[in-house]
Amino acid sequence: MINRIRVVTLLVMVLGVFALLQLISGSLFFSSLHHSQKSFVVSNQLREQQGELTSTWDLMLQTRINLSRSAVRMMMDSSNQQSNAKVELLDSARKTLAQAATHYKKFKSMAPLPEMVATSRNIDEKYKNYYTALTELIDYLDYGNTGAYFAQPTQGMQNAMGEAFAQYALSSEKLYRDIVTDNADDYRFAQWQLAVIALVVVLILLVAWYGIRRMLLTPLAKIIAHIREIAGGNLANTLTIDGRSEMGDLAQSVSHMQRSLTDTVTHVREGSDAIYAGTREIAAGNTDLSSRTEQQASALEETAASMEQLTATVKQNADNARQASQLAQSASDTAQHGGKVVDGVVKTMHEIADSSKKIADIISVIDGIAFQTNILALNAAVEAARAGEQGRGFAVVAGEVRNLASRSAQAAKEIKALIEDSVSRVDTGSVLVESAGETMNNIVNAVTRVTDIMGEIASASDEQSRGIDQVALAVSEMDRVTQQNASLVQESAAAAAALEEQASRLTQAVSAFRLAASPLTNKPQTPSRPASEQPPAQPRLRIAEQDPNWETF
C-alpha cells in the first residue's frame, strides 16, 4: 500500500502535517500571548488606578492633618487672631486638597474594570462627601469659626472613605491574585501543549522516517547497487521495484537504460566486426590507389614538360607576330607619308598649270600688243611715205619698229606654243600624279588592313600564350595535387590500419559486458600491415603540406 504513494505526495503530507502543527502551536501561542497581554494590561491598569487612589487618600489625610494642626493653633491663640502659621497650614491644606483632586480626576479618567465598578462607585460617593467636608473645614478655619469646625462630623466621613479605600484595595488585590493565578494556569497549560506537540512531532518524524526509508532509501539503495553492477559490465541482472512512486519510475528508467545499453553493446559488437572487415578492405584499396596515383603523377609530369615546350613555341610565334605587326605598322606609316608627299606634288602640279595658263594669257596680251605695234608701225610707214623726203627718217624708224614688233610677235607665238605644250604636259603630269596619289591611298589602306590583321594575329598569339600558360599552370597544379593525393592516400592507408586496430580494441572492450543471452565469443583479430610500412612515393615536385586546392580538385 505504501509503495503506491508517490514521494511528492508523502512529502506534501508531511509538510502539511507540520504546517498544521505549526498553525495549531502558533494559534495556541498567540492565544496565550493575547491572554498574557490582556492580564498585563489589567494589572497595569489596576496598578495605575491603585496608585492614583492611594495618592488621593494620602493627600486628603495630609489635608486633614494640616487642618487639625491649624485648628489647634487657633485654639491655643487666646486672641483668636490669624497667625502666619495658621495661614501657612491652611495654604498647605488647600494645595494638598487640590493635588488630591487632581489625582482623583486621573483615577476617574481611567475606566474601571468590570469587577471594580461597584467599588469605584462606592469610593466616588465617599470621596465626594469627604472632599466637600474638607472644603468646608478649610472655609471654617479661614473665617476662624472653630465651633463649626469641631461641630462638623468629618471623622465619620473620613472613616467611611477609609473603609471604601480599604475595600477597593482588597478587591484590587483579589483581582491581581486572580490574574497571577490565571497566568500560572496558562503557563502550565502551555507547558502541556508544548509537551503534546513535541510528542506528536516525534511520532510524525518516526512515521515520516519509516515512510521515507520504505519508499525512498531502500529502493534507492537497490537502484544504486544495480547501477554499480551495470558500471561493472554486468547487464544480465534485472531490477524489479513494485509500486507507482518516483522510485518505481526511476527503476523502470534504469531498466530501460539497461535494455538500451544491451542493444547498443550488441550492435557495437556487430558493428566492430563489420568495421574490422571494412578497414582491411579500405587499407588494401588505399594501397592500390596510392600506386595508381603515383603513375598518374608521372604522366602529369610528362604532360607538364610538353606543355612547357608548347608554351615556348607559342611565345616565339607571338613575338614574331608582334615584330611583323610592328613592321607592318612602320610600312603603313611610310605609305601614309608617301601619300602625303604625292598629295603635295599634285597640288604643286596644279599650281604650275595655273601659272602656265596665266603666262599664256600674258603672252597673248604681248602678242596683241606686238600686233597693234606692227599695225601702228605700218600706219607710220604709210604716213612717212606720204611725207616724202621729210618723213624718210621716220619711215626708217617705223620699219625698225615693225621688224621688232614682228619679231616680238614671232617670239610670243613660239613662247605661247611652248607654254601650251608645257601646260599640256603639266596636265598630263597632274593626271598621272593624281593616279599615283590614288594608288598610294590604296597602298596605305592595304598596309593598314595588313597592320590590323597582324595586330589581331599578335593579340591572338598573346591570348594563346596566356591560355597555354594557364593550362601549364593547371597541369603543374594537378601534378602537385596528385603528389599530395599520393601522400594523403598513404596517410589514409595508415589511418585505415589504425582504425582496424581500434576496431579490434573496441571488440575486446565490448566483450567485457556480460549479457543475459549467450555471450559473443571474440574471434582472433589479425591486424593487417599498416600503410606506414608501404614504400612511400617519391614526389617529383614539391608537395605543400596544406593546400586549399585539394578540395577543389
Swiss-Prot record:
Signal peptide: none annotated. Residues 64-73 are annotated as: The 3 Arg may form a positively charged pocket, which binds the alpha-carboxyl group of the attractant AA. Keywords: Cell inner membrane, Cell membrane, Chemotaxis, Membrane, Methylation, Transducer, Transmembrane, Transmembrane helix. Its main location: membrane. SMART domains: HAMP, MA, TarH. GO terms for molecular function: identical protein binding; protein histidine kinase binding; protein homodimerization activity; transmembrane signaling receptor activity. The modification Glutamate methyl ester (Glu) is found at E302, E491, E500. Residues 519-531 have a biased composition (Polar residues). Residues 1-6, 212-553 are cytoplasmic. Belongs to the methyl-accepting chemotaxis (MCP) protein family. Receptor for the attractant L-aspartate and related amino and dicarboxylic acids. Tar also mediates taxis to the attractant maltose via an interaction with the periplasmic maltose binding protein. Tar mediates taxis away from the repellents cobalt and nickel. Chemotactic-signal transducers respond to changes in the concentration of attractants and repellents in the environment, transduce a signal from the outside to the inside of the cell, and facilitate sensory adaptation through the variation of the level of methylation. Attractants increase the level of methylation while repellents decrease the level of methylation, the methyl groups are added by the methyltransferase CheR and removed by the methylesterase CheB. This is Methyl-accepting chemotaxis protein II. The lineage of its organism: Bacteria, Pseudomonadati, Pseudomonadota, Gammaproteobacteria, Enterobacterales. The gene is tar.
